[in-house]
Amino acid sequence: MAIYLTELDSKSLDFPPAENALADPNGLLAFGGDLTPERLIAAYHHGIFPWYGPGEPILWWSPSTRAVFDPNTFLPAKSLKKFQRKAQYQVSINHATPEVIKLCGNTRPAEETWLNEEMQAAYISLALQGVCHSVEVWQDQRLIGGFYGLSIGELFCGESMFSLETNASKIALWYFCRHFSEHGGKLIDCQVMNSHLHSLGAFTLPREEFLQRLLCLKQQRVTSGCFSPQWLKRHNA
């Protein structure tokens, strides 16, 4: 049976409705276009994100269920609290965004390198526009973990994370959830559920509910200073 898939017009930033995404493969909505900052921003504002492998065209997705965190109710595991009390990790925001993006792509096994140089350059461009942000974890002035994503009002769209030392990415998420919540953040989008996200407390929303929440959250703003370059206070767990 033939499958109809929209090819994006290079001269237009319009996307088909996210509800038109295929059931198999789950969430595939369109192909083509480019990774300009304008198109990426338009995509995320409609609950759509790019993901494609080597040799494939740019593919755009909006899966039927969305993995998310509620930063206001995020609870770290007791073992993570215990680890944090002993670890000499420091956490920052927007101190090394290009480096975080590159490490998210370069520290993955070869078969998982969807975050290619083209994608990395696209998100670095968004960082220069103040749309893409990073959370960094440091040990003895060495960058050992973190993640990056896009801010859309009271929603943060997490893209990718990396960890070079034990629990580094978990510490990054924990600290960011508290910081984001304190500045009025309401939801963190993780796109597709996996065992690691589930173990950290992520849950899923049906696409329709996620899009409804996105519509409301993108019209709001977190409080001033949320994404200013800064060091986050150490938690007294």
From Swiss-Prot:
Entry keyword Electron transport: no
InterPro entries: Acyl_CoA_acyltransferase, Leu/Phe-tRNA_Trfase, Leu/Phe-tRNA_Trfase_C, Leu/Phe-tRNA_Trfase_N
Positions in coiled-coil regions: none
Main localization category: cytoplasm
Signal peptide stretch: none
Keywords: Acyltransferase, Cytoplasm, Transferase
Compartment(s) where it occurs, according to its Swiss-Prot or TrEMBL record: Cytoplasm
EC id: 2.3.2.6
Keyword Signal part of the UniProt annotation: no
Gene Ontology terms describing biological process: protein catabolic process
Catalytic activity: N-terminal L-lysyl-[protein] + L-leucyl-tRNA(Leu) = N-terminal L-leucyl-L-lysyl-[protein] + tRNA(Leu) + H(+); N-terminal L-arginyl-[protein] + L-leucyl-tRNA(Leu) = N-terminal L-leucyl-L-arginyl-[protein] + tRNA(Leu) + H(+); L-phenylalanyl-tRNA(Phe) + an N-terminal L-alpha-aminoacyl-[protein] = an N-terminal L-phenylalanyl-L-alpha-aminoacyl-[protein] + tRNA(Phe)
Entry's Gene Ontology cellular component terms: cytoplasm
One Gene Ontology molecular-function label: leucyl-tRNA--protein transferase activity
Family: Belongs to the L/F-transferase family.
Summary of the function given for this chain in its UniProt record: Functions in the N-end rule pathway of protein degradation where it conjugates Leu, Phe and, less efficiently, Met from aminoacyl-tRNAs to the N-termini of proteins containing an N-terminal arginine or lysine.
NCBIfam families to which the protein is assigned, alphabetical: aat
Protein name: Leucyl/phenylalanyl-tRNA--protein transferase
Organism, scientific name: Vibrio vulnificus (strain CMCP6)
Gene: aat
